[in-house]
């Protein structure tokens, strides 16, 4: 994925009530609301390494904000400062590992979480309403 951008057009459709989005282990000190962001994984055939898993930092949005309109998220794989690993370390801090991971991407997609965690899952508070997440476009293109 070296030299590539990934973008996704996402939205939420409310189907009843006023859904309140939650995340696993809520509340936490970090306070980040239930969100969606990009994720990629490199080859994990060896022992577990924090730097095998990466999440976009800025290219993210809250599920609450998607109730009022669709958004397009975009992130550059060539920008290590736009990503953090499983342990929360920036791609600039772990530059060698980030560069190696980008050269050997095995999976790329979207991840849902909140609080201090980008991957802990999200849901809707019981009795608050109902909604569904929409993915209208997911594209990987060369960086301009």
Indicate residue ranges for each PLM-predicted region:
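Extracellular and analogous surface-interaction loops
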Residues: 1-4, 27-29
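Extracellular Ig-like/FN3 beta-sandwich strand-entry sites
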Residues: 3-5, 70, 103-107
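Extracellular ligand-binding interfaces
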Residues: 9-89, 113
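Residue-level signal for functionally critical sites in structured catalytic/ligand-binding pockets
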Residues: 37-42, 129, 134-136
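Extracellular beta-strand ligand-recognition surfaces/modules
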Residues: 78-132
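Extracellular beta-strand elements of beta-rich domains used
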Residues: 108, 135-140
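Short, solvent-exposed mixed-charge patches
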Residues: 143-144
């Amino acid at each position: 994925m070296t030299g590539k951008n990934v973008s996704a057009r996402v939205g939420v459709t409310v189907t009843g009530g006023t859904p309140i989005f939650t995340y696993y282990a809520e509340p936490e000190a970090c306070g980040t609301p239930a969100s969606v962001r990009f994720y990629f994984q490199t080859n994990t055939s060896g022992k577990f390494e924090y730097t095998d898993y990466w999440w976009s930092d800025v290219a993210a949005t809250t599920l609450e904000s998607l109730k009022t309109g669709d958004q397009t998220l975009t992130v550059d794989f060539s920008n290590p400062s736009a990503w953090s690993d499983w342990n929360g370390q920036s791609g600039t801090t772990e530059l060698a590992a980030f560069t190696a991971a980008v050269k050997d991407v095995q999976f790329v997609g979207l991840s849902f979480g909140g609080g201090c965690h980008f991957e802990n899952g999200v849901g809707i508070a019981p009795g608050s309403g109902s909604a569904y997440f929409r993915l209208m476009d997911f594209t990987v293109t060369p960086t301009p």
